[in-house]
Regions:
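Extended, compositionally biased non-globular segments
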Residues: 36-68, 81-99, 103, 121, ...
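Extracellular structured ligand-interaction cores
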Residues: 72-74
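Flexible helix-coil linker/hinge segments at domain or subdomain boundaries
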Residues: 102-133
Length: 243
């Protein structure tokens, strides 16, 4: 697709054949909605809910029971593609942004628009398929430009960052630049590398680079780089042995 950002988050991705929209008003109502989908045969178990964000519990082997008993333990984000330009698969700045974005959502007033999940799915597929281009998204039944809506949220996140003293303004600036210039997106950069080197060669070159970097740093203990190398090795082994 011309201008695609993420094939996996578009029609080519792993998803439910029929769109499923659980209830998120409360943990209890969320559980009840999943149980209803299972009883109706829409899905066979909670594991077959392939939404972009899933509520996870203390005991995910018995998810629904544990959610009811223990509440939400953490959120599983399933829409984040692997970043091939970072050897960890995701950059630290992107993680900081996700952290800030979660805080922003906690403070953001909810809309009472009832079709928000349907709109979100349409927006997701539009961004995934044509996200490098300027396009219109749906927001509470109205059309809004992608960049306008994105900048609005980033400005609100900037205010939250300043209010809470989080010192993440650099992260927000990175996202603002990426929103304004599609050539800064990972998708565009990957396509350009593949054009120059070929798909297989590009991936192998990155893999070899990360292997070499890991090998050169095999004795380094992160966070203690200012110590003697022998001390770092000793501390590293101690941690491995649980000391």
């Amino acid at each position: 697709s011309d201008g695609a950002l993420s094939y996996r988050n578009g029609d080519c991705g792993y998803q439910n054949k029929t769109a499923i929209f659980p209830n998120y008003d409360s943990v209890g109502e969320h559980i009840a909605s999943l149980e209803r989908f299972i009883q109706e045969g829409t899905i066979e178990s909670h594991k077959e809910l392939y939404s972009q964000i899933r509520l996870k519990a203390k005991d995910n082997g018995n998810l629904l029971e544990s959610l009811q008993k223990d509440g939400i333990c953490y959120l599983e984000y399933r829409s984040i593609d692997i970043n091939p330009f970072d050897r960890a698969g995701i950059s630290l700045n992107d993680l900081y942004f996700m952290q800030l974005f979660n805080l922003y959502l906690l403070f953001k007033e909810e809309s009472d628009y009832t079709l928000w999940q349907e709109e979100a799915l349409e927006n997701q597929k539009a961004i995934a398929t044509h996200g490098q281009k300027e396009l219109q998204l749906k927001k509470d039944g109205n059309l809004v430009l992608k960049e306008d809506w994105g900048m609005e949220m980033l400005q609100e996140m900037r205010k939250l960052n300043d209010t809470l003293g989080l010192d993440k303004q650099d992260v927000i600036e990175i996202m603002e630049k990426r929103l304004k210039d599609y050539q800064l997106t990972y998708a565009y950069q990957l396509v350009e590398v593949v054009k120059r080197e070929g798909y297989v060669a590009a991936c192998l070159n990155l893999a070899k680079q990360y292997k070499d970097e890991a090998y050169k740093a095999r004795f380094i203990f992160k966070g203690y780089e200012d110590m003697e190398l022998s001390t770092q090795m000793l501390l590293k082994e101690a941690v491995k042995r649980g000391i």
